[in-house]
Amino acid sequence: MRRSVGEAVKSNSIYKEEDTVVPRAELPKLLKGVKSIGKEHGFKSVCYGHAGDGNLHINIIKGDMNDKAWNEDLSKGIREIFELTVSLGGTISGEHGIGFVQKEYMDIAFSEENIAIQKGIKSIFDPKGILNPKKVFI
């Protein structure tokens, strides 16, 4: 069933999928929070995932939102979802890792010092910037 949910969402509306993880005991709080954030910003969501490991796929549905509201409110809502996730002891990326999407929100999950360390490690192993260029660190 889980594999069918994403296809059903795709066939009904424009959507944006996020991938979060929280401790299993915090899943109810995250779900309730996602619904509350969506209500505040005018979007609905379909959530599913791997409850056994706390992974939650959040499909934010455009539905009837106009393009301006979708484009302006979406990143605010995602930021709030990620802030909630981290406040519950979770991470802003589950099984897919940090990439183009989460790059904008790394400040929520990592301190400036931690990001500097990550950039330093990347520069040691990839001084020419040819491995996975522009994905997270240029």
Say what each PLM segment does.
Residues 1, 50-57, 95-105, 134-138:
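A glycine-rich phosphate-binding loop feature that marks nucleotide/adenosyl-phosphate handling sites
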Residues 1-77, 84, 88:
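C-terminal substrate-recognition/cap domain of FAD-linked oxidoreductases
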Residues 12-14, 98, 123:
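Short, functionally important structural connectors and interaction interfaces within domains
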Residues 20, 49, 93-94, 123, ...:
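Short conserved micro-motifs on helix faces and helix-strand junctions that flank
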Residues 69-73, 77, 98, 106-109, ...:
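Short amphipathic alpha-helical interaction segments
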Residues 79-81, 120-121:
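Alpha-helix-loop-beta-strand connector modules within alpha/beta enzyme cores
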Residues 86-98, 127-131:
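Alpha-helix capping/hinge segments and adjacent helical runs
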Residues 103-138:
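Activity-critical C-terminal alpha-helical subdomain
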